[in-house]
Amino acid sequence: MFESKINPLWQSFILAVQEEVKPALGCTEPISLALAAAAAAAELDGTVERIDAWVSPNLMKNGMGVTVPGTGMVGLPIAAALGALGGDAKAGLEVLKDASAKAVADAKAMLAAGHVAVMLQEPCNDILFSRAKVYSGDSWACVTIVGDHTNIVRIETNKGVVFTQADNAQEEEKNSPLGVLSHTSLEEILAFVNAVPFDAIRFILDAARLNGALSQEGLRGSWGLHIGSTLAKQCDRGLLAKDLSTAILIRTSAASDARMGGATLPAMSNSGSGNQGITATVPVMVVAEHVGADDERLARALMLSHLSAIYIHHQLPRLSALCAATTAAMGAAAGMAWLIDGRYDTIAMAISSMIGDVSGMICDGASNSCAMKVSTSASAAWKAVLMALDDTAVTGNEGIVAHNVEQSIANLCSLACRSMQQTDKQIIEIMASKAH
């Protein structure tokens, strides 16, 4: 069943997962600004005294209401300040992992003194944009990130331009391992998962380790909305059944609770999002435990889940009005279905039912309530799998669901790419009005 050699397509799949599934400490939008601030601070000899920052509307949306790990505070200003004063620019999405208590205190003092300003970049044609300009005495440094949470495109100081990334987006897309996703299919992904050597994908077990630890932390503490721990209490009170469906709901919610509540543990992200990584991981872990899967089966199921989630999300804008926990849960549905019967038809039916169920869920910014959407998406994924196991699914006669799963995915993604752009603007306007 398993092949010893890795063909070029499979190698591209592996590289795509390695590119998109990475550890991240804290919600990735404020972390992107923290990284810009840290990288700018690294260009200066003195201590940063003041910060001006500019972000895209989508990054503002996802940074307004989320807790920054280790600070107990929400928002982009504290992320920028802590990045500048205690961040490690070389750590990427884990830029704040070694921030000291002193750095946190200094960052809070900088905010209290009114020395941090975060503004909308206007006009802004980029969905993901963050720029931090930091000052120390008469010196300054400015770093700009565009397109991806860690993609630094320009570094400039008062002495001149230090670095600029050439504008070769088409060439980068051609050379990117993600480029293969534009001309592949779920069937090819499944064939890869079924036959690739275990040693080549063993690394994906780190997702189970990191996101499993977040789930345990979420159940121990009162993080965020503490959905997971609250539902666990309702089980003890006899108000909720202690079964597999509930375990998926509770353990997935708990990981997102800890993530959004500011726990100082990294998540294994997917497509630039910790919650997407959690959603693609934890439900699969729970089902794998239930069926007694060994590490190899778990790795294959996780690879199917994460790669399917990446495949779907690759057809979306990096950030949009569509809650991407839903698309990550489509990956989880594939992984869970594979663990139980392994048939392509079951996987396809489960994803189609997901599209017919949760496709209208909006993204109204990163916050503690993301855990609600993560839990809803995980529950919907398991429901879709249970239906598919009995050869039942939302069909092409209903709504945006088509007669084949690939077209259903394309239909869903076309909504986010085109029709939901005005929705996104309205969401941002509503959130901005609340901030004043």
UniProtKB/Swiss-Prot annotation:
Family, as annotated: Belongs to the UPF0597 family.
GO biological process terms, alphabetically, are: L-cysteine catabolic process to pyruvate
Among Pfam families, the record links this protein to:
SDH_alpha
> What does UniProt list as this organism's lineage?
Bacteria, Pseudomonadati, Pseudomonadota, Gammaproteobacteria, Enterobacterales
Q: What is this protein called?
A: UPF0597 protein YhaM
Q: Which organism is it from?
A: Salmonella dublin (strain CT_02021853)
* One term of GO molecular function: L-cysteine desulfhydrase activity
